């Protein structure tokens, strides 16, 4: 796994499923940054304080797409929460060596989608 960025990415999601903090800590670089529509370049310490507690809600990730572009891995997944709700996101992980240096999360939608096929909802994100 040491030099395979796709395996490193997969291992990070597996650590979330297992709630294995020591496994995820070994995969996250000291100079790590995390961004999402709600978070702007959180450092490693803040990421673990703010985001790691969400692992308690995650039951599983089903990978739709995992694509490598050099040191970057694009991951689209459907996640299942322990309460049975589901959602879909896409993430861009940057791998340096054998650790994750950066994650960008792009929020997707709930499953099932709240809009009918061919339609839309009237609420804004």
Give a label for each model feature:
Residues 4, 17, 35-37, 48-125:
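A beta-strand edge to alpha-helix "cap/lid" segment located at domain peripheries
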Residues 25, 44, 48-49:
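Short, well-structured alpha-helical segments
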Residues 40-42:
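Acidic-and-aromatic substrate-binding clefts and catalytic sites of carbohydrate-active enzymes
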């Amino acid at each position: 796994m040491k030099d395979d960025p796709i395996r490193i990415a997969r291992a990070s999601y597996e650590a979330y499923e297992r709630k294995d903090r020591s496994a995820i800590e070994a995969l996250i670089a000291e100079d790590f940054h995390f961004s999402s529509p709600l978070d702007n370049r959180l450092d490693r310490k803040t990421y673990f304080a703010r985001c790691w507690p969400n692992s308690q809600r995650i039951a599983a990730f089903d990978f739709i797409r995992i694509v490598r572009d050099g040191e970057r891995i694009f991951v689209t997944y459907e996640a299942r929460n322990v309460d049975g709700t589901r959602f879909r996101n896409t993430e861009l992980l940057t791998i340096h060596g054998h650790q994750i240096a950066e994650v960008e999360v792009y929020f997707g939608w709930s499953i099932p989608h709240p809009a009918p096929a061919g339609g839309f909802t009237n609420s804004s994100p």
